[in-house]
Amino acid sequence: MYGRGKRKSKNQKYFELFRKFQERQVTYDWHTASFQGRNNYCKTDPDATFMHMKDDHMRNAQLKPGYNIQIGVDSEYIVATDVFSDRKDVWTLIPFLKTMDEKLGFRYPSVTADSGYESEEGYTYLRETRQTPYIKPQTYEKWKRRSFKQDISKRENMAYDAETDVYTCYAQKKLSPVFVKKQKSKSGYESEVTVYECEDCKDCPHKEKCTRAKGNKRLYVSKSFLEKRQESYENILTETGIQYRMNRSIQVEGAFGVLKNDYEFQKFLLRGKTKVKLEILLLCMGYNLNKLHAKIQNERIGFHLFKVKSA
């Protein structure tokens, strides 16, 4: 019932209110579907995610819509690339490797990646596929610092008895396992975390430097992750591991440097993940053609890895 001088009935009011709620719900459902597991998306390009860009030199925390581009490099050629909406590299490793296996038709015997790709799930996947990991631990650089080595709160600086499964802290107190809990990652991977608790932190003169907890000091340890991390850590310290890590830095970062700076490709011209992937594929093809031409000119055909210079 509409028009001047007419009062709407209660049913009419309820009906119109319900219709507004229904329209809002449809809009909210569409927005929720557009998130695709993210906490934000760009209205002009729903596949894009707001991220911190490296061009924010003043660190003003500027957020811009973008994509996480991953490339795989072999012998200085880009052999695989993919586009992700997730901002963290760690969640792109397994999907990227699966795409590589599918597209290339074979599997590389080893995988070299930066510390941003390290996770228990990634290590487990590489072990299942029988690929040797050369992944730098996330705490690799911290381990070298004097402040880390002198931090009594760190598990790495505590003595560990493998037979009794007990840690000993700086004050010579025992940290024993009290329970095991399950943790699920974003992708659904389930890991076991053993919780260790100190026998008594009361009146300990070092408590302020060791823990902020009101009660006893606790450690949360994934034994499976530590075992796999140690394996990868030992791999990167070998001669092969050192050479692979050096070449990852030269070839992968070098490829991104050429694409961004030499080609001056700072911004995608198209929108949507499918179109962006097509754009980066064409760009990588051009890069590979230029790389092939440069290798022919410099008589470097068959050259795969840069050698480590002896000190």
Model-derived regions, located:
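Anion-binding and metal-coordination hotspots
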Residues: 1-311
